[in-house]
Amino acid sequence: MAEKTEKPTAKKLRDAAKKGQTFKARDIVALIVIATGALAAPALVDLTRIAAEFVRIASTGAQPNPGAYAFAWAKLFLRIAAPFVLLCAAAGALPSLVQSRFTLAVESIRFDLTALDPVKGMKRLFSWRSAKDAVKALLYVGVFALTVRVFAGLYHADVFGLFRARPALLGHMWIVLTVRLVLLFLLCALPVLILDAAVEYFLYHRELKMDKHEVKQEYKESEGNHEIKSKRREIHQELLSEEIKANVEQSDFIVANPTHIAIGVYVNPDIVPIPFVSVRETNARALAVIRHAEACGVPVVRNVALARSIYRNSPRRYSFVSHDDIDGVMRVLIWLGEVEAANRGGPPPETRAPTSAEPQARDGVAPPGDACADNAFPDDAPPGAAAPNAGSPDGGAPARTGDQNA
């Protein structure tokens, strides 16, 4: 059998919690309940009300009805004891729920005959937890003896003074001394409680330790094969809806960044002369948009500055291109129209001197950042030569033969 050396996983801890196997420092819960009761007793337990009831009965001298008399005492007892009991119950329930992380142990409620197995009972009798409880019991005996010794040294005068106290003060004095004794015992037992909680936490994780095979098997059951899951997740992320695919096919061009952003631009002068954003995707979906555009013959222009600017200034799909980006978009549309005119064998596009805001190309290669950076013609290109694909640096057939709206 493999040695269990691995720490329990989060799933292992959750499954154990459903079975009722959670970290439980019962003595800490008892400490909180006792401390709450000791501090609340002087305020909630009013013995003067009981004494006043006796005085009332004695002063009247009448024979009370036994039924009414018992009912009155029961009602008085509930009025005094109910708040005290409810407060102690809440003080005990809240720490228990916190320790179990508010997990309902459904499986532990079911009747289990294996709990009556004598072999398992003998194992529990001679387990590390049983040895821990035995040592803890001996330590508590020593703590109680120390508490009595310290209490006698501090409050012996008050204890012997009870014989000379007035009867009306006896109840109050007994409550005060009892509270002091309880709090002193809890203070002396605090080191034992901390040590018990630490050992209990160690034993709890020791019982839930796993071997390496269990860890691997649990990972396969919960996550599946890592390569298959990664591939499936990648394919799922790259799938485009039919609406986005249709928008890509109807776009005049796609401007990319070049792998993280894909912006589709559509212009229809019959509707409105201002171009608007038809596609707006990022990361894996942007890559899918680029691939689909190349497959459908839609030009893909890789322009980092323009793509980032449109993405920043047009926060959603189906919004108009901002005023700051219209110039760059129109330059791309004009260039695409010139490329398609050259591909149809028409006259070569007119050569014009670039403006100061438009960088010149050197040796037929467009400067970085230009919308046509990947599609420049060499100076000696013959008229009517086929232009490279707007989205492919290695050239080839034109991406689309339809007219571009400039």
From Swiss-Prot:
Stretches of the chain forming a coiled coil according to its record: none
Membrane topology, from the record: Multi-pass membrane protein
Subcellular location(s) of the protein: Cell membrane
Family: Belongs to the type III secretion exporter family.
Organism of origin: Burkholderia pseudomallei (strain 668)
Any single Pfam family the record assigns to this protein: Bac_export_2
Name of this protein: Secretion apparatus protein BsaZ
Domain of life, per lineage: Bacteria
